[in-house]
Amino acid sequence: MKKLKLNYLLIGVVTLLLAVALWPAIPWSGKADNRIAAIQARGVLRVSTIATPLTMYRAGDTMSGLDYELSQAFADYLGVKLKITVRQNISQLFDDLDNNDADLLAAGLVYNEARSQHYQAGPIYYSVSQQMVYRVGSLRPRSLASIKEGQLTIAPGHVAQSELEQLKASKYPDLTWRVDPKLSSNELMLQVAQGTLDYTIADSVAISLFQRVHPQLAVALDLSDEQPVTWFSRRSSDNSLSAALLDFFNQINEDGTLARLEEKYLGHGNDFDYVDTRSFLRAVDSVLPELQPLFEKYATDIDWRLLAAISYQESHWDSQATSPTGVRGLMMLTRNTAQSLGLTDRLDAEQSISGGARYLKDMMSKVPESVPEEERIWFALAAYNMGYAHMLDARALTAKQKGNPDSWSDVKQRLPLLSQRPYYSKLTYGYARGHEAYAYVENIRKYQISLVGYLLEKEKQAAAAAQPKLVQSYPTNITPQGLFPSPFSSLPLGPFSQAGAGGKTHSALPNTLSPVSPR
């Protein structure tokens, strides 16, 4: 998978160029007939989306997602409340714009020329590529020329439709594919993972997240270069909304918010390990149920699933684990640490988990207050692994190299340098296995993603079994405190990949789902 990145330079250039063109619209707060004034008079920013692990979803009592956090921040920027409408497919999203039922679409939508002819695109904030996937163990296609009739199915409205049409016309005249009128990219990927469908196409971000829960899904081919992802609004002679978006994205780019969100949601999508992920999910089924009550009991300040992920990284949930260096137990505590915490038996599961949780809390309390709240845990974990003093050295080295010592994205890049003489010889606390601390934190983040997604999917499967005739419930209007469906579910919650084809009709085939109430 290609490295994911936010297009900071592109955002800056676009902002500079378009700000000139949109300058008359920038003082939008004083105009009564523009869209920003209408939003502020209404007191609500209306955003339509599709629930995915990257865009917006609810896990427990917490709302998450890159587009959710950006939407909430933009609503705060405008001084209004946020109203989210969840739709089933891409076509319904653009219908919301056409019918003036939404101010913005924030759903991981790919920018393309066809869409730009009918809708106003906002700043580009990350990029994806389109990839064909297959099931591990089945025949991997080496090129589109090897695809036989009936093997490739894509979701309606997917941007791959236009890509495939161009490839068929230019290079693969015998290429055929099917557009399923009912299933989303999410559901098609699930069918591929289960072996009931040969191939489908999704975007690289969607695939990387899906693999954390279904490691048997693998990438066969790259079908496109990196494609920009953006928000969309209605085209209008009034440019106040576009001007406000440009100013907002420029502001969060300059203050570091955009970089922090990139690190949070896109900073751990590479280096997928099939064997490791599969082993982890097997342990979730076979070992975790016995330990889960203890993780829930002692994870007072962090998500219990994160504490469980830390323990798996430390010991693979083996309460008898012992390393050559003398650390032992589920949380692999040293003898001195255990004594300082009042523990009498490091091999006792409850003592180890409670001690590890308290030690981690102590590390978090030492992280400088200037570090953003949501990133403090990663600094604490690095300190947990290599020692607090070496974490301070990593921050100092980051600042010396003109990076941001309060940004985990910046600091983690310097961790491997702590084991290189030209760097550690000039640091206060000297040599450290910084490369191990880097891998340690990244592995924990990946395990947490897998665990959250896997457990959410199991919950949905159990609910579906108890209520087989699930009533379709779209559209759903929510606030940040409202109900939000799980994005990892095999139920029709919407596709992971929202890279739909352009055009005013929005999708290749008409919708087959009807809203529960008129819009």
Curated annotation (Swiss-Prot):
One of its GO terms (molecular function) is peptidoglycan lytic transglycosylase activity. Its main location: membrane. One of its GO terms (cellular component) is cell outer membrane. Gene3D superfamilies: 1.10.530.10, Periplasmic binding protein-like II. This is Membrane-bound lytic murein transglycosylase F. The active site is at 314. Residues 1-32 form the signal peptide. Keywords: Cell outer membrane, Cell wall biogenesis/degradation, Lyase, Membrane, Signal. One of its GO terms (biological process) is cell wall macromolecule catabolic process. It comes from Cronobacter sakazakii (strain ATCC BAA-894) (Enterobacter sakazakii). It comes from the Bacteria. In the N-terminal section; belongs to the bacterial solute-binding protein 3 family. It is found in: Cell outer membrane. Its EC number is 4.2.2.n1. Pfam families: SBP_bac_3, SLT. PANTHER family: MEMBRANE-BOUND LYTIC MUREIN TRANSGLYCOSYLASE F (PTHR35936:SF32). It is a peripheral membrane protein. Murein-degrading enzyme that degrades murein glycan strands and insoluble, high-molecular weight murein sacculi, with the concomitant formation of a 1,6-anhydromuramoyl product. Lytic transglycosylases (LTs) play an integral role in the metabolism of the peptidoglycan (PG) sacculus. Their lytic action creates space within the PG sacculus to allow for its expansion as well as for the insertion of various structures such as secretion systems and flagella. Residues 33-269 are annotated as: Non-LT domain. Residues 508-519 have a biased composition (Polar residues).
